[in-house]
From Swiss-Prot:
Organism: Leptospira borgpetersenii serovar Hardjo-bovis (strain JB197)
Similarity annotation: Belongs to the YbaB/EbfC family.
Xref: SUPFAM superfamilies: YbaB-like
Assembly: Homodimer.
NCBIfam families in the cross-refs: DNA_YbaB_EbfC
Top-level taxonomic group: Bacteria
Keyword DNA-binding: yes
Protein's name according to its UniProt entry: Nucleoid-associated protein LBJ_3002
Entry keyword set: Cytoplasm, DNA-binding
């Protein structure tokens, strides 16, 4: 328990620098663009580091098919792939900014589930 209080004290003493670093991380995350794909690139989805879908590409050949379920599945798979990549890229930015600090451990100190 005393170690946790000491760690918290150190964290609080560096709040100004931490705020600046977090603002920088926010900017980098906002600039992240990742592409998820499915069907060997027949469907691609672009997402931001903030988890917003900003572009969807569907190859024209898929519109000629009568298999709507296949198209739906490809769009869903590409979207999930893009969001997974965005989450991984965001986690990487946080890890890089914190010098490898595990945010899930900090979260546990406060009884939360942020990481």
């Amino acid at each position: 328990m005393l170690d946790k209080i000491k760690n918290l004290s150190e964290l609080l003493s560096n709040m100004g620098a931490l705020r600046e670093k977090m603002e920088d991380v926010k900017k980098r995350i906002a600039s992240i663009r990742v592409v998820g794909d499915a069907g060997a690139g027949m469907v691609t989805v672009t997402a931001t580091g903030e988890g917003q879908i900003i572009n969807v590409f569907i190859n024209k050949q898929l519109f000629d098919s009568d298999d709507n379920k296949m198209l739906e599945d490809l769009v869903m798979a590409a979207t999930n792939d893009a969001l997974k990549k965005a989450k991984e890229a965001t986690a990487y930015e946080f890890q890089a900014a914190s010098g490898g600090l595990d945010f899930s451990e900090i979260s546990k100190m406060f009884g939360g589930n942020f990481g």
